[in-house]
Every structure is written in structure tokens, then in C-alpha cells.
Amino acid sequence: VEKIAGMDVEPMDMNNIPGCTYASPEISSVGYTEQAAKDAGFEIKVGKFPFSASGKASAAGHKDGFVKVIFDAKYGEWLGCHMIGANVTEMIAEAVVARKLETTGHEILKAIHPHPTMSEAVMEAVADAYDEVIHM
């Protein structure tokens, strides 16, 4: 519609559209899988954080699931994010925005994440990818 109206339209990045499955547990993802990133020629860093290590998840009784992140090892580009667990369809937005803005893993680690929250599992997974995780 914007194009028909004569507006400048930014090309859509089809690899940055979040996928959300509303089931129990919920599933969400954006970007490359590990295999797709390797197939595309990337050398990757992968981090994973289980909700069983999250204080908020434990308190809420939602300890099943995890957050997994995939980064380009050379430049730190956030290539993909995959989550399984309670409320993860709400949490994928951080990865979508970070990918859109070409945020690196180190920038995510420097951003203050609220604690205790389920969403801080994203930061913890990033920390794991960079061998800086402390809460696991």
C-alpha cells in the first residue's frame, strides 16, 4: 500500500520476521538456525541459557525451555535466536529489533536487563556465546 501511495518503501528482510508458535510450550525464532548459518558460510558462536537457571522462571513454575542465540564469530552480527518456553513469543522482539539495528552481542551484554525477569535469559544466552555467563 505504501508503494502504491508513492512512498519510499524499505525492502523487507524476510530473514528477520519472527516465527511464533502459540502452544504449550510456546516456540519463537528469528533468523538463521545453526545449520543454515553454517551453510551460508558463517563461522558461528552459539549460546544457550536454560530457564531452569532463571530465578524468575523458577519462582513462576516455568523452568522448562531455553533461549539459544547464534552470532557471527568474526563480526558479532546476531544471526539467529530460538526460544522454547513460557512467554517466549513475547520475548523474541528483543532479537528482532537487535538484528534490525545490527546490534552485536557485546552491545546486548552492555545493555541493562531487568532482574528478575524471564527476558533476561536472552542476555544470559548471549553471555554464554561470549563465554561470559555467570548465572549457570
Segments from the language model and where they lie:
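Flexible, glycine-rich terminal cap/loop adjacent to redox cofactors
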Residues: 3-6, 17, 23-136
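Glycine-rich active-site loop/strand segments that organize a redox cofactor
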Residues: 7-13
